């Protein structure tokens, strides 16, 4: 058997090594971007007198108490009735991000609504007919211009700005063919007209 080699342990090398640097402090979490507040008083009304009269007529149709006011929760409905397609988030933003309690309790007059309508109308990010059709084309597995009604119901109730089951049913009433399919181009025309 071969003799063992005398292996010397480096004693001084371990002591001379500098201590590891402390771990850097974790970076602070990125601050949430602040929602820009919309200054409704700074919005210039660009609608004609005829348009304003039409908007006021629609606004007053939503007045349930006869005081020429609507609740904040009705603003989105009036905006959509007048042909705009704002998201719920856009409506809340133009309202100043009110609490749910304020949505149902606070009321506004037409003069307060008009700058909101102008702000939404000025928004260039509004989805177009083509945007909606392209979004539904993703679900057209056969490439024949139709989507399954059941799948569309599921999408409307569970993705994005979720709709209530009653809203989905009202929206889709009379849209399905005998096979349970929906022509999505006709469907988009239908929803953009209501």
UniProtKB/Swiss-Prot annotation:
SMART domains assigned to the protein according to its UniProt record, in alphabetical order: EFh (SM00054)
Region described as Disordered: spans on this chain: 1-35
InterPro entries xref list: CALM/Myosin/TropC-like, EF-hand-dom_pair, EF_hand_dom
Keyword vocabulary terms for this entry: Acetylation, Disease variant, Methylation, Motor protein, Muscle protein, Myosin, Phosphoprotein, Repeat
PROSITE patterns: EF_HAND_2 (PS50222)
Sites bearing N,N,N-trimethylalanine, chain numbering: 2
GO MF annotation: an example: structural constituent of muscle
GO cellular component: contractile muscle fiber; cytosol; muscle myosin complex; myofibril; myosin II complex; sarcomere
Positions of modified residues (Phosphothreonine): 71, 87
Positions of post-translational Phosphoserine modification: 73, 99
Single GO BP term: muscle contraction
Domain of life: Eukaryota
Biased composition (Pro residues): 19-31
Oligomeric and partner information: Myosin is a hexamer of 2 heavy chains and 4 light chains. Does not bind calcium.
Disease tied to this protein: Congenital myopathy 14: An autosomal recessive congenital myopathy characterized by decreased fetal movements, severe muscle weakness and respiratory failure. Additional features include delayed motor development, areflexia, facial weakness, normal eye movements, head lag, and mild contractures. Skeletal muscle biopsy shows variation in fiber size with atrophy of the fast-twitch type II fibers.
Entry function: Non-regulatory myosin light chain required for proper formation and/or maintenance of myofibers, and thus appropriate muscle function.
Name under which the protein is recorded: Myosin light chain 1/3, skeletal muscle isoform
Species: Homo sapiens (Human)
Gene name tied to this protein: MYL1
